[in-house]
Amino acid sequence: MVKEKVILAYSGGLDTSVAITWLDKDYDVIAVCMDVGEGNDLDFIHDKALKVGAIESHVIDVKDEFAEDYVLVALQGHTFYERKYPLVSALSRPLISKKLVEIAHKTGATTIAHGCTGKGNDQVRFEVAIASLDPKLKVIAPVREWKWSREEEINYAKANGVPIPADLDSPYSVDQNLWGRANECGVLENPWNEAPEDAYDLTVAPEAAPDSPVYVNIDFEAGVPVALDGKKMKLADLILELNDLAGQHGVGRIDHVENRLVGIKSREIYECPGAVTLLAAHKEIEDLTLVRELAHFKPIIENELSNLIYNGLWFNPATEALIAYLKSTQQVVNGTAKVKLYKGAATVVARKSDNSLYDESLATYTSADTFDQDAAIGFIKLWGLPSKVHAEVQAHKDK
């Protein structure tokens, strides 16, 4: 009997490795791992999938596409879920889903499988994205279906020849990509526990960071970071370099109790050294170049966009419309931000732009001042007129 094909989003971990053998009863499994900058041993992952029963194994480098089509939206949109989380994992899920659907179409597969549990956000992100791209594809979530304890899963793995990962005893659940690292579980589940140092990997403790700051100049063209200290770089490479540099100075640690889409609160530890640095720099160039009305309105868009992406609605028309609006604001966002990295902080200490709306001759309080202060008298009268009329009417009513 010819089996149907299933495309499995494969990580190389225990859950998705067990999923291959579990799915193999009814499907020919094609394992697919997307490299979004997590830094894993991709050759090992490729070979392991075949070893545990996949008929094909694909490892696809999508770092550049991830950076240019997804991370850049988060950067230009200053996306912080609940004003704190820079959308690390949430950003990669739509791209991974898109690639899974593409491979399903190429191979004739009718089903896609993922390794998410039934209590996380990622199951929603994957399945909503896949349904948005091809509603006819079936989606299977083995971990959600088998409902095993960890011990039962390990016993199944041993019985079916699935290698047990060396780091299985780690109490943490980690997800990582170019934009940062997310960590949960173990001692972190108690929000009263301070996160221990072994929960971090990309950053040193701020108090252990160098006692002297380092400065980095970041160049932007149309809202895109294009160079570090004058060195032109692809966006993915620039982010990775900043992850290393800012991480050495303890930048980008985030401890967040967040409201998950599925209705529970979770405590997460994020490390986003490159993201935090770039977000600070980009915001300062915007402050220099955007007109006041746009600078005041854009954060409203940013907050809504953050929620849409976090909640798995990347391919929703609302998200697409907001991204289009966002892109239209970036043509003037050109310039250089000088960022000071020191003891956990990324602080913009200087900025310049050929599109700068800052006019020193208008802002100065020296004799070079060109601001017409006499014009303020009439402006104040007109600006305050509605308030004055309201006060007069209220005073008349109170008599």
Curated annotation (Swiss-Prot):
Q: State the UniProt keywords alphabetically.
A: Amino-acid biosynthesis, Arginine biosynthesis, ATP-binding, Cytoplasm, Ligase, Nucleotide-binding
The residues that the entry says bind L-citrulline are: Y85, N121, R125, S173, E258, Y270
List the protein's name. Argininosuccinate synthase
* Subunit annotation: Homotetramer.
What organism does this protein naturally occur in?
Streptococcus sanguinis (strain SK36)
* Molecular function terms, GO-annotated: argininosuccinate synthase activity; ATP binding
- Record PANTHER family: ARGININOSUCCINATE SYNTHASE
Record has ATP-binding as a keyword:
yes
GO terms for biological process, alphabetical: argininosuccinate metabolic process; L-arginine biosynthetic process; urea cycle
Pfam entry (one)? Arginosuc_synth
Task: Give the metabolic or biological pathway.
Answer: Amino-acid biosynthesis; L-arginine biosynthesis; L-arginine from L-ornithine and carbamoyl phosphate: step 2/3
Question: What family is this protein classified in?
Answer: Belongs to the argininosuccinate synthase family. Type 1 subfamily.
Main localization of the protein described in the UniProt heading: cytoplasm
One GO cellular-component annotation of the UniProt record comes to: cytoplasm
Q: What is its EC number?
A: 6.3.4.5
Where does this polypeptide localize? Cytoplasm
Which residues make up the binding site for L-aspartate?
T117, N121, D122
Q: Where does ATP bind?
A: A9, Y10, S11, G12, G13, L14, D15, T16, S17, G115
Q: Which reaction does it catalyse?
A: L-citrulline + L-aspartate + ATP = 2-(N(omega)-L-arginino)succinate + AMP + diphosphate + H(+)
